[in-house]
């Protein structure tokens, strides 16, 4: 049987907290805060059996409730201990709950900054510019790109910063619920995305992404892009999309090297094929997964296809390429 070129694990929205089960912000979904660590442990055990070579954690590793209980560090220690059992590099994407718990400077100096865990083929990054985005080649002919979806945001930037001011302007231009900007400005449609718990990508980050993909085009690489926020309207609920998702899609559609864009944030998950042929995958969230189920995946990269084996709520998926 053919061996894959590279194998890696995928998981999203663990949102662990040592508290009783509860509900989401809109009180429409059940959340299993304490049990999420058990599901993470099960995922790690399976990845060990499958001998994955790295794991990509798509953001929201602990829940914002921890900050209010002064338990952020303790909760992070709990989930990191589970991930340490993988014995492989874990690449962390940052979501809104990372910023509920920690400031950007704190995150950059924490274990959730995985930019240096890129093996022998270290690529470029924007860490020095205070943007948590980096890329590397996990195996010949493949490239991973991790994006900072809260580069533009009011929760991911210090209040005195220019980016916070710019982000506030964007948000309040579209959302007039000034008493609670986590409430969407409309009840249906793409404008729902302009909420405080979302964010976007700066022009600098988009230019960097374009340059990375241009080089991958020339090298004939297959590129997998990871972000907490999804960018395709057909792969997620509109309320979960990045503010400037169209700008990201414009960049992606101009490069033949893009294989797929993998995100979290929408706990229901989603899948679609873009007009360019790129796949958009939104992984189901652990936090809203009942204790008797699972929500993670193992992805196998071959020379001609990517096979994603889902567990529990995550469905299998195969992407073929030539």
From Swiss-Prot:
Pfam families: Metallophos. Zn(2+) 2 binds at residues 60, 96, 228, 265. Its cofactor is Mg(2+). It catalyses: CDP-choline + H2O = phosphocholine + CMP + 2 H(+); ADP-D-ribose + H2O = D-ribose 5-phosphate + AMP + 2 H(+); CDP-glycerol + H2O = sn-glycerol 3-phosphate + CMP + 2 H(+). The keyword Cell division does not apply. GO terms for molecular function: 2',3'-cyclic-nucleotide 2'-phosphodiesterase activity; ADP-ribose diphosphatase activity; CDP-glycerol diphosphatase activity; manganese ion binding. Belongs to the ADPRibase-Mn family. This is Manganese-dependent ADP-ribose/CDP-alcohol diphosphatase. It comes from Danio rerio (Zebrafish). The gene is adprm.
């Amino acid at each position: 049987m053919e061996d894959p070129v590279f194998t890696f694990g995928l998981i999203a929205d663990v949102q662990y907290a040592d508290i009783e089960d509860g509900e989401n912000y809109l009180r429409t979904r059940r959340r299993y805060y304490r049990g999420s660590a058990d599901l993470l442990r099960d995922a790690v055990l399976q990845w060990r059996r499958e001998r994955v070579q790295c794991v990509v954690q798509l953001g929201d590793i602990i829940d914002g409730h921890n900050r209010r209980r002064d338990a952020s560090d303790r909760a992070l220690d709990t989930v990191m201990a589970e991930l340490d059992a993988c014995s492989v590099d874990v690449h962390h994407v940052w979501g809104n709950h990372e910023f509920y718990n920690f400031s950007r400077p704190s995150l950059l100096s924490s274990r959730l900054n995985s930019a240096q865990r890129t093996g022998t083929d270290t690529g470029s990054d924007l860490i020095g510019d205070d943007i948590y985005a980096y890329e590397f080649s996990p195996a010949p002919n493949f490239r991973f790109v991790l994006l900072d979806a809260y580069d533009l945001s009011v929760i991911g930037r210090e209040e005195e910063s220019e980016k916070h001011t710019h982000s506030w302007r964007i948000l309040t231009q579209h959302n007039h619920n000034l008493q609670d900007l986590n409430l969407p400005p409309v009840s249906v449609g793409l404008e729902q995305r302009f909420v405080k718990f979302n964010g976007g990508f700066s022009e600098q980050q988009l230019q960097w992404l374009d340059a990375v993909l241009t080089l991958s085009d020339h090298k004939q690489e297959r590129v997998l892009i990871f972000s907490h926020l999804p960018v395709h309207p057909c792969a997620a609920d509109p309320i979960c999309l990045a503010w400037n998702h169209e700008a990201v899609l414009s960049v992606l559609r101009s490069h033949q090297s893009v294989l797929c864009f993998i995100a979290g944030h929408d706990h229901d998950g989603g899948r679609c094929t873009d007009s360019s042929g790129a796949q958009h995958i939104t992984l189901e969230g652990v936090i809203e997964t009942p204790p008797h189920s699972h929500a993670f995946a193992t992805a196998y990269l071959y020379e001609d296809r990517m096979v994603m084996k889902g567990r529990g709520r995550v469905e299998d998926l195969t992407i073929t390429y030539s």
